[in-house]
């Protein structure tokens, strides 16, 4: 599968490549890259056939957008790429510094347009649910921005499934443009979205765009029980905080080393078992653990494009190579089994076997159309 195996994003005519370039690290110091490195990464992605670029207003305090605006303008690439940015997280102080209200979205979007040196955004993501803005207001705001030509499409991230379902239902009933894609944490280490978000996306014609498919580096093969348990704390502070302190990470300093907001949830017995299986599949196939983990994500139901965040050009090349991997049925089954999330009581009622016998009286019933 080459990078030029383009696909539509959701039920729309927006065409994207199978990997999306995430630029959260553009402009950061500790965990990312400065302008020359970011330019090289951007160029390598475009040369590989990629056309989908993702950023946000808060990434590197706006520096990520500024860099992208320059790269795109200098390369005369605006018409050939799909440019996505986000709003929702606070970019300052005060109640209107963030959120999903019309006031903040419009203000944030205008600032993003200036930094990106463009007059429209192809895909505007709602970055996070604010828990207070009515779905009706958010939908009307996004529809108005589409009508005004400020954005072409919109999607949503880090938001409860019930709220997204309400947005999508209102959009259909009112004849307004609804969200076409969902951006969520999805990897072998975390498959929580499979219970609600994946089937909801299929029902409403939305694509899944996974972020952190390597689980913040956990699935790259850099970590194991012994090294984590024996390691002395390093890189104190959250990655975002450390990145703003102007420090360049030391050689060998990894994303999950030392104090960080992810280790407690990722360094678990379940994930060590996933890594053991991933390592075994890697040894049997000759592919790196990272490539196998990426291949697994890209082949999951509903996934149209997968975000890759990189800090070196070589990582672009390695990630793209994962598109050519086709895992055997046995290897796929092994990874699926070891990474299967614990089934909640409610969802155990929806398993095919129970549905066949307890609901349809022993008959096999298939749904042919979404």
Q: What are the residue ranges of the model-derived segments?
A:
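Terminal-tail/helix-coil boundary detector
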Residues: 2-3, 203, 226-284, 299-304, ...
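N-terminal binding-site loop/beta-alpha segment at the start of enzyme catalytic domains
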Residues: 1-81, 147
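Generic structural signal for well-ordered alpha-helices
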Residues: 42, 65, 69, 109-113, ...
